[in-house]
Amino acid sequence: MQKYTSEARQLLALAIPVILAQVAQTAMGFVDTVMAGGYSATDMAAVAIGTSIWLPAILFGHGLLLALTPVIAQLNGSGRRERIAHQVRQGFWLASFVSVLVMIVLWNAGYIIRSMHNIDPALADKAVGYLRALLWGAPGYLFFQVARNQCEGLAKTKPGMVMGFLGLLVNIPVNYIFIYGHFGMPELGGIGCGVATAAVYWVMFIAMLSYIKHARSMRDIRNEKSFGKPDSAVMKRLIQLGLPIALALFFEVTLFAVVALLVSPLGIVNVAGHQIALNFSSLMFVLPMSLAAAVTIRVGYRLGQGSTLDAQTAARTGLSVGVCMAVVTAIFTVTLRKHIALLYNDNPEVVSLAAQLMLLAAVYQISDSIQVIGSGILRGYKDTRSIFFITFTAYWVLGLPSGYILALTDLVVDRMGPAGFWMGFIIGLTSAAVLMMLRMRYLQRQPSSIILQRAAR
């Protein structure tokens, strides 16, 4: 029992800074929306449309680079710290190549935006302008993620938290300058949010790089030599590990986007109620997602040390803590669902629907916690390919079709509207949780030599 208590303390010590970093990141998006809305409703809508395209593109790169965390954690645990700098250099090369692809996609996103049904031309122009300003921040964002993953792989999660709040503090005044045109800068409205956010990502990267350069704990792995050439073997391995994570993230983001589009013809009340419940459940998701990042670090580190039993302890402890958190947040959601909905909107119909959907959200929080922490465990074992297949099957083969049938057809029951899609979420997330646990159990039952051989690759 004592080893589980000790492991839980270490997991929470790693997870809490990640939670706070995610809060800072979410707050940046909130600030952009509010400040753009203060300028005009059109600018706020342009930022919202631009963000809906930016997120899938940049999260694909983000997911690809998540491969660095278990690699570095395993090298750290095995005492091969001298190899970490080379892995990080290749991470920067990979981020550079992905940045170019993301920038090309975002530069040409105008074709997607202008093809939207009945979109106002002025709104489309502002959304395109926002993306074309923001895309210059893509390299800064991805370079920052490489540096952050280096720190987190070494069990240093506080720097990411500090840089997140630094970015938030810088974002507010820089937004003000470029939205309203102060200190000699042009008045750009919502496009100014894109300029500000791009600048903030570069500030965060430079600050993180400065920390790494001066941190005593990283003195032995600091790269003082030339940057070096791309290493095709290392980059291939990072892509093999990272691509399934990137695709899983992409399919998860696009799933919720598709559901939002399917709900949109059902009327303003349904759209608003769905959005409130989804926004709140996304905030609650920060907790298990951050714990999953901590579990990846601990499992990778323990496997690096050559202890499959300690890796199992880390995995089981992470799941136990995650389920306890989910039970607490589910009770909180059920108890205060009407009060929470009133914070977003005071329309009685919207509040009533949002409160009903939050009941379903409370049900799936436990499944969601298990599946996302399960994904973190599998990342720690470097078994990322299964994450993609499980996510795709659970979300797109089981969750979305069942949600569509329940919400918009009479095949099983009378049309349920948005609640049908939320039943689909429950089916998809529960399926993912079960499949993740089965895969984890299969991996942990293999001989230690095979587990450690996979982890050392």
Swiss-Prot record:
GO CC terms in record: plasma membrane
Record keywords, A-Z: Antiport, Cell inner membrane, Cell membrane, Ion transport, Membrane, Sodium, Sodium transport, Transmembrane, Transmembrane helix, Transport
GO molecular function: antiporter activity; xenobiotic transmembrane transporter activity
Example of a GO biological process term: sodium ion transport
Alphabetical list of Pfam families matching this protein: MatE
Xref: InterPro entries: MATE_fam, MATE_MdtK, MdtK-like, Multidrug-R_MdtK
Compartment annotation: Cell inner membrane
Major site of localization recorded for this protein: membrane
Topological category with respect to the lipid bilayer: Multi-pass membrane protein
The keyword Amino-acid biosynthesis is assigned to this record: no
Transmembrane spans: 11-31, 53-73, 93-113, 127-147, 160-180, 188-208, 243-263, 276-296, 314-334, 357-377, 387-407, 418-438
UniProt family annotation: Belongs to the multi antimicrobial extrusion (MATE) (TC 2.A.66.1) family. MdtK subfamily.
Function: Multidrug efflux pump that functions probably as a Na(+)/drug antiporter.
HAMAP family on file: MdtK
Protein name: Multidrug resistance protein MdtK
Taxon lineage: Bacteria, Pseudomonadati, Pseudomonadota, Gammaproteobacteria, Enterobacterales
